[in-house]
Amino acid sequence: MFDIEDCKVTFLTEDTYEVSFPAGRMLLKYETEPPHGDEVCSVYFPESNNELPYWCYLRNIKQISIDKSTESFFISIEAVKPHQWSGVVNLIIEPKHSKYASLDDWYPSVKVEENKICFYNSYTKKEYILDDFQQLNWQSF
């Protein structure tokens, strides 16, 4: 039912990256780098001319599809509010409809298990089970 893959991140210019996926692409513009490394980028969707109100860590960018369909397609990122690098949360983005939902915590590990997606943080031992995208608290961007 669910399929998860790492997104391909392509370096475009000195401060811009592109993430391509079946339903389009998103551009990541370098904004800052926290003391521990890992670049943090603003997120722009050129097809819809929308910018995400969060910045994205340049790591663990995943594409999630349901039954390998481009009609039911999502992206998972580790994100922070702009101009910050703490308070990391996972966001699920539905690019086709310009909306996102926060999982309200940080889960660096993501995997599929028996028709559900398991987000897990081995540091805090917290887990988030996602089996229905309609149950998320969606916000437009």
Where are the model-predicted features located?
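Surface-exposed loop/turn elements that mediate protein-protein interactions on large endomembrane-trafficking
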Residues: M1-V9, P35-L58, H83-D105, K125-F141
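Repeated scaffold domains used in trafficking and secretory/extracellular systems
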Residues: I4-P22, C56-T70, S102-S122
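Short beta-strand elements that form the blades of beta-propeller/WD-repeat-like
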Residues: Y17-P35, E71-K81, K116-S122, E127
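Extended low-polarity, hydrophobic cluster-rich segments
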Residues: P22-L28, V43-F45, Y54-N60, D67-V80, ...
